[in-house]
C-alpha cells in the first residue's frame, strides 16, 4: 500500500505538470529476464524507491539492474553500487526525455527506446518493467509498431483513432496485475517510442488528438483490427465466442489484391487427421468424413470445420497449426494437405491493408472509419485522470 500511495503521488504531480495522463504499460511483456541495462539517451532522470530519492541519472550515464538470489534489485550506476531494492522508479525531467533499455535473458532481446517514467519491480518470475507514458506518446509507439513507418498520414489518422479507442476500452484489462495494458498484440503492439522516422505518424496522432469512436448512445465503440481480412470480415462469435451486433460479416474488396491477401501452408495428412481424432473424436474410419476433411471448401467465412454438428471450431485449427487465419480451404497433395488461405489475422473490424488501399484511392479517414465500423461516430473523450 505504501508503494502504491507513493507512486500515485508522483504520477499526480507529473500529470498535473503536463496536463496529460499516464498509462501504465508493461513492456517486454513476452520475455522473462533477471537483469537489464539502460542508458539515458536524451535528458536527465531521477531514481527513487518507495522510501525516497536515490540518485540523479544524467544523459549518457548507464544503469544496470540484476535480480539477486534474494529476489532484490541490485542497482549500479556507471558501475557504482547504489543499493538493493524491491521497487524502483526512474522519472524523467521532461516529456521529451527517453531511455534505451536492454533486458538480458536466456533469449537475445533487442534494445528499445522509450519515453516516460518507469517502474521496475522484482518478483518470483524475474523483473517486471512498466512504462508510465502519456497516452498520445503511447499511440505514436503503437502506430509505429502496428503499422510501420511507411503509411500515409490519412491512414495513421485512422489507426490513431481506433487504437486510442481500443486503449480507452481496455484500460483495465490488466488491472489485477497492477498495470493498464501490456505491449503484446492482444493489447496492442508497443515496441518503443516514435523516433521521428515518419513525420506522418506524429501528425496522424496530433491531428486526431482526443478523438475516439462511440456508438449512437455515446458509449465507447469496441474497435478491433487485423492485417488483412481476406476479402470478407469475420464476426466476433466466429473468433471469440462473443457476439457484438455491430460486427456483421461483409465483403471487403479493398484488400483482395494486397500483399497478405493469400497464403498457403502444407500439413502432413497423418498429423492433421490425428489432431482431429484426438481433440474432437473425429472418426478416422468414416471414409466420407475423411474425404470431407481433406477437401474442405470455404468460399465464404465459416465458423466450424466441415459442419457445425461436428463441433470443430476453425479458430482451434488455426491455433493448433499456427495458421495465418481461419479463412482457408483444403486439398490433398500426396501425403500432405495443402491449405489455401485468405487474409492474415482474426479479420474483425478494420482491415489494415484494406484501409491503406482506401487511402490510396483518395478516401478520407472518416469515410474509412464509417466503412469498417458501422454505427460509429467520432467524439472527443479523455481518459479518466485517476483510473484507480
What are these regions (language model features)?
Residues 18-388:
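Conserved, single-site charged/polar hotspot
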Residues 4-14:
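Sec-dependent N-terminal signal peptides
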Residues 2-3, 20:
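N-terminal secretion targeting segments of exported proteins
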Amino acid at each position: 500500500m505504501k508503494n502504491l500511495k507513493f507512486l500515485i503521488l508522483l504520477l499526480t504531480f507529473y500529470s498535473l505538470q503536463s496536463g496529460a495522463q499516464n498509462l501504465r504499460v508493461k513492456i517486454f511483456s513476452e520475455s522473462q529476464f533477471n537483469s537489464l541495462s539502460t542508458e539515458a539517451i536524451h535528458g536527465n532522470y531521477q531514481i527513487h524507491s518507495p522510501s525516497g530519492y536515490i540518485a540523479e541519472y544524467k544523459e549518457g550515464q548507464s544503469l544496470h539492474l540484476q535480480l539477486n538470489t534474494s529476489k532484490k534489485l541490485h542497482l549500479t550506476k556507471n558501475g557504482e553500487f547504489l543499493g538493493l531494492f524491491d521497487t524502483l522508479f526512474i522519472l524523467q525531467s521532461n516529456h521529451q526525455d527517453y531511455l534505451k533499455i536492454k533486458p538480458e535473458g536466456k533469449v537475445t532481446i533487442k534494445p528499445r527506446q522509450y519515453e516516460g517514467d518507469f517502474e521496475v519491480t522484482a518478483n518470483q518470475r524475474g523483473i517486471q518493467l512498466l512504462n508510465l507514458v502519456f497516452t498520445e506518446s503511447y499511440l505514436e509507439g503503437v502506430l509505429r509498431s502496428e503499422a510501420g513507418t511507411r503509411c500515409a498520414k490519412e491512414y495513421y489518422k485512422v489507426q490513431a483513432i481506433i487504437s486510442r479507442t481500443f486503449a480507452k476500452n481496455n484500460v483495465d484489462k490488466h488491472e489485477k496485475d497492477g498495470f493498464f495494458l501490456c505491449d503484446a498484440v492482444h493489447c496492442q503492439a508497443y515496441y518503443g517510442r516514435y523516433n521521428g522516422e515518419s513525420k506522418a505518424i506524429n501528425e496522424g496522432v496530433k491531428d486526431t488528438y482526443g478523438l475516439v469512436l462511440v456508438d449512437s448512445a455515446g458509449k465507447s465503440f469496441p474497435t478491433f483490427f487485423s492485417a488483412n481480412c481476406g476479402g470478407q470480415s469475420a464476426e466476433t462469435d466466429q473468433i471469440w465466442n462473443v457476439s457484438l451486433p455491430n460486427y456483421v460479416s461483409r465483403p471487403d474488396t479493398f484488400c483482395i489484391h494486397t500483399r497478405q491477401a493469400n497464403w498457403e501452408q502444407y500439413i502432413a495428412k497423418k498429423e492433421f487427421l490425428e489432431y482431429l481424432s484426438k481433440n474432437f473424436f473425429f472418426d478416422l474410419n468414416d471414409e466420407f468424413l475423411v474425404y470431407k476433411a481433406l477437401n474442405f471448401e470455404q468460399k465464404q467465412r465459416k465458423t466450424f470445420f466441415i459442419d457445425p454438428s461436428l463441433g470443430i471450431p476453425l479458430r482451434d485449427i488455426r491455433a493448433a497449426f499456427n495458421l495465418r487465419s481461419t479463412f482457408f480451404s483444403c486439398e490433398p497433395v500426396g501425403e500432405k494437405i495443402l491449405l489455401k488461405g485468405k487474409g492474415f489475422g482474426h479479420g474483425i473490424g478494420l482491415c489494415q491493408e484494406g484501409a491503406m488501399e482506401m487511402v490510396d484511392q483518395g478516401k478520407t479517414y472518416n469515410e474509412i472509419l464509417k466503412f469498417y465500423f458501422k454505427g460509429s461516430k467520432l467524439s472527443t473523450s479523455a481518459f479518466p485522470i485517476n483510473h484507480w
